[in-house]
């Protein structure tokens, strides 16, 4: 009987060992796949094909709204390109805390002005995608800094920071402006991942030079947006996929996607925040904006634009969009 128990115990241990090995191999394989896909600089996470549209509960944008958005987008792009070619500008760079070089462009409206705006682009995007926002700030008398986010466009870096690493990079850009002008009054504007960045930064100990934040289409947390996209793109459950992703991302990219939460950070914000979102956003659901707004423990306001998709509020109703921003900034 004792011999039989030993055999059973041995078999059990072997079975457990096999399960552990399979789990480790699966975690390494699946985790690496999704890290490569989602946050590796050379990954193809920017090619978004929705396989489960039912997981994204948004209203369809009507044809008239689409026409308005496309026409305004075309006009804004042309005007912004003309603006960027005529205004004084210079290339600048900073070293991030982890040693990589970050690059950006400053557009100088008035060298003697204290008014500055830092404009941040979105996931796998470029400064050119948001240059029209810089143009509008410039028209209001702001000097403008538009950086390339880490692992995007002109900046170095192997892994996209999803806002969490970028909040530290943003501090470097803020410090650069303050070094140039110790009396600078700085506005932070971010779109999509850029919005997540400024919201995540809001909970940090920001210099008093930072006067306000504008977050357009920001997500609540890295975990939440990846969970939403895993369902939409692959029709996959959160567990165990994201858990495997989390483990590998911690090792390779050096940040925890569970810790990377804009929702938690805005609870500690002392900086006024304006939240903007389109009610037809099929990438970052509108409810995330509502949750962020409710959680923010600071002076705040929000603008929801009807029939606007992801970061398209500025094209759907440009006058409303910019009037709201500068009205908010005028009241802080």
What is each PLM-predicted segment?
Residues 133, 262, 271, 285-294:
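Short alpha-helix in the alpha/beta-hydrolase fold that links the catalytic acid
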Residues 160-181:
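Alpha/beta-hydrolase active-site loop
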Residues 2-71:
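N-terminal membrane-anchoring alpha-helices
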Residues 134-156:
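Conserved alpha/beta-hydrolase
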Residues 70-112:
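N-terminal cap/lid segment of alpha/beta-hydrolase-fold proteins
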Residues 268-270, 275-277, 281:
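Short beta-strand/loop motif that positions the catalytic acidic residue
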Residues 200-256:
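Hydrolase active-site cap/lid region
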Residues 293-311, 318:
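Catalytic histidine neighborhood in serine/cysteine hydrolases
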């Amino acid at each position: 009987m004792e011999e039989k128990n030993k055999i059973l115990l041995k078999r059990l241990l072997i079975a457990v060992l096999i399960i552990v090995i399979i789990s480790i191999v699966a975690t390494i394989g699946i985790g690496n796949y999704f890290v490569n896909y989602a946050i590796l600089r050379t990954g193809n996470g920017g090619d978004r094909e929705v396989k489960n549209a039912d997981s994204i509960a948004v209203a369809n944008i009507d044809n008239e709204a689409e026409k308005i958005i496309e026409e305004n987008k075309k006009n804004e792009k042309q005007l912004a390109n003309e603006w960027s070619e005529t205004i004084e500008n210079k290339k600048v760079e900073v070293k991030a805390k982890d040693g990589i070089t970050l690059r950006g462009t400053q557009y100088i409206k008035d060298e003697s002005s204290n008014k500055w705006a830092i404009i941040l682009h979105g996931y796998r995007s470029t400064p050119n995608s948001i240059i029209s926002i810089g143009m509008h700030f410039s028209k209001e008398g702001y000097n403008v800094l538009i950086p390339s986010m880490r692992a995007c466009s002109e900046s170095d870096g192997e892994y996209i920071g999803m806002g969490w690493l970028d909040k530290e990079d943003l501090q470097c850009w803020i410090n650069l402006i303050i070094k140039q002008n110790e009396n600078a009054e700085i506005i932070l504007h971010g779109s999509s991942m850029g919005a997540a960045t400024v919201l995540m930064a809001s909970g940090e100990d920001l210099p008093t030079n930072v006067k306000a934040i504008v977050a357009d289409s920001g997500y609540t947390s890295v975990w939440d947006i990846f969970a939403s996209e895993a369902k939409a793109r692959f029709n996959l459950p959160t567990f165990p996929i994201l858990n495997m992703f989390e483990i590998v991302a911690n090792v390779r990219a050096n940040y925890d996607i569970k810790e990377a939460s804009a929702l938690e950070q805005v609870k500690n914000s002392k900086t006024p925040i304006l939240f903007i979102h389109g009610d037809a956003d099929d990438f970052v659901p509108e409810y995330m904006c509502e949750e962020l707004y409710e959680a923010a423990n600071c002076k705040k306001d929000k603008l929801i634009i009807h029939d606007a998709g992801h970061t398209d509020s500025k094209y759907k109703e440009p006058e409303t969009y910019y009037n709201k921003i500068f009205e908010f900034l005028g009241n802080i």
